[in-house]
């Protein structure tokens, strides 16, 4: 089954109605959920960042609701970095000033797992070779 990573910017925006990208993020999440888009890999770092942001802006109940929905949905896959990917993430963080540590870990995971597609609104990823950032509900595996 094809997969793509999902960044905090998309996950948070979909869950938080006041986010300026909420209406753009919803079709991405719905497409993942209904199978018109590839399954989503959610790194544990991304999940933590998203849940912390939701707790701050929308409250604990909203964060728990999102966590439950992600865990219960077979199209969302929570993954952790391997030791090698973590080492790569630290190196990328040191080398690429625009990337946050979580973003560097996303890139490292994608490189070590051979994944090229990332749903993200953060254009800092555009500076990284072999990462194809998707900012709309586009299926990169469907040529039609």
Regions found by a protein language model. Give the residues of each.
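PIN/NYN-family metal-dependent endoribonuclease catalytic core
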Residues: 4-6, 27-57, 80
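Short active-site oxyanion
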Residues: 36-40, 75-77, 114-116
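Amphipathic alpha-helical segments within well-ordered protein domains
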Residues: 12, 51-52, 90
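Glycine/small-residue-rich phosphate/adenosyl-binding loop
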Residues: 55-71
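Active-site neighborhoods of divalent-metal-dependent phosphate/nucleic-acid chemistry enzymes
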Residues: 78-117
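Acidic, PIN/NYN-like endoribonuclease modules and their adjacent C-terminal/linker elements
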Residues: 1-3, 112-144
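Metal-dependent nucleic-acid phosphoesterase active-site entry motif
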Residues: 1-20
């Amino acid at each position: 089954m094809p997969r793509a990573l999902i960044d905090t910017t998309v996950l948070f925006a979909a869950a938080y109605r006041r986010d300026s990208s909420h209406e753009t993020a919803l079709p991405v999440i719905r497409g993942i959920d209904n199978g018109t888009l590839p399954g989503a890999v959610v790194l544990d770092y991304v999940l933590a960042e998203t849940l912390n942001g939701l707790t701050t802006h929308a409250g604990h109940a909203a964060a728990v609701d999102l966590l439950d929905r992600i865990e219960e949905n077979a199209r969302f896959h929570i993954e952790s970095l391997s030791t090698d990917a973590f080492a790569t993430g630290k190196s990328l963080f040191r080398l690429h000033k625009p990337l946050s540590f979580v973003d560097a870990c996303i890139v490292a995971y994608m490189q070590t797992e051979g994944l090229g597609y990332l749903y993200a609104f953060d254009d800092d990823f555009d500076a990284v070779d072999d990462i194809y950032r998707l900012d709309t509900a586009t299926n990169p595996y469907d040529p039609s």
